[in-house]
Swiss-Prot record:
Its main location: mitochondrion. The gene is Sucla2. This is Succinate--CoA ligase [ADP-forming] subunit beta, mitochondrial. Substrate binds at N323, G380, I381, M382. Its EC number is 6.2.1.5. It is found in: Mitochondrion. Residues 61-288 form the ATP-grasp domain. One of its GO terms (molecular function) is succinate-CoA ligase activity. ATP binds at K98, G105, R106, G107. One of its GO terms (cellular component) is mitochondrion. The modification N6-succinyllysine is found at K88.
Amino acid sequence: MAASMFYGRQLAAAALRSHRPQTTLRAAAQVLGNSGLFNKHGLQVQQQQQRTLSLHEYLSMELLQEAGVSVPKGFVAKSSDEAYAIAKKLGSKDVVIKAQVLAGGRGKGTFTSGLKGGVKIVFSPEEAKAVSSQMIGQKLITKQTGEKGRICNQVLVCERKYPRREYYFAITMERSFQGPVLIGSAQGGVNIEDVAAENPEAIVKEPIDIVEGIKKEQAVTLAQKMGFPSNIVDSAAENMIKLYNLFLKYDATMVEINPMVEDSDGKVLCMDAKINFDSNSAYRQKKIFDLQDWSQEDERDKEAANADINYIGLDGSIGCLVNGAGLAMATMDIIKLHGGTPANFLDVGGGATVQQVTEAFKLITSDKKVQAILVNIFGGIMRCDVIAQGIVMAVKDLEIRIPVVVRLQGTRVDDAKALIADSGLKILACDDLDEAAKMVVKLSEIVTLAKEAHVDVKFQLPI
């Protein structure tokens, strides 16, 4: 399924904002691919379309503990009083308070309370209480969240460790390797994108045979390449093997440890964990998927998931409803080609029902930036008349007052056109995709200009 270069990048950025599968690791993979490092070894980086679940750090750390992976001692607090009690219980001179928000860049973020930084070192239970009170119940604004920010409902209170060295370690599924791959670097605790861009040779990898599984010598080899001292190579390898087993057990698409460290006592610890899970495994990973925190998601993401619709919000003014991810991105590109900006990626899939089409329109029109809508359907498995029924129902029920341009081709297209024509609604039909894109761009510009001038524009255009 081909993905356009332009909107591959746009969707990656949007996925980061909505905490979908595009992570720092995938961004690094893209940079690595561009660097020529993979080509040098006869490998290719391929982006894979997946819907994934991300969990809070404290939940990921609990999974690591259950798997026998070495992690710092810590507990989650949902109030400042709980943070005080945990800090006292840990009995350490200093502890770390980490805001539990599903967004990268926490350390450089700012809370609506005015507190700067979502990761703080404190030196007493009293200070733990004071700092956590400025985090819990407040929104953390980072580069990834945008101005809206994300609510912080709890904090992780954990013991502070003093690392001698920091490393980066991750496991991901990569099609070009035909299975999982371990990725490591001696440069941990920093943005892996920067490492990949500035020093790609610092990143090492070890493909794993999905049938044979991970071998200890593979983990040992990677640990050595990452620069672990000889006296703790075996310990690092053991943690990598346990992480790989966790990766398989829970149908993860990515496990990222940044940093994995050698602490002042010479022990290997995983200081931070990000785990993404394949949403296709929800039926057999109920324990994991019941942990999803919907307060961290855009309300439209939740509605889309409930309706089984692939949706990602963008920043444009033209709503898109398409069947098939490849056609959806091609549609977005042709809108951009003619000077428009898509407001979303929306794929209703090959077997959409009338209800799903209606739900798709609800998602699109809930975005107040949308000034016009383009429906582009190529009916193979998907019947055009079903789409048409959904369009007519949605336009009526939602009282849509912005232009709707429809381009239908394929199965039962004549029945679909008849349904639209007989509806009496001002839905604009167009057989040619290029013409449909030009039309929706012009109409969105007219609506935008009219709203800016406080003019009420009514579209009385023939079908």
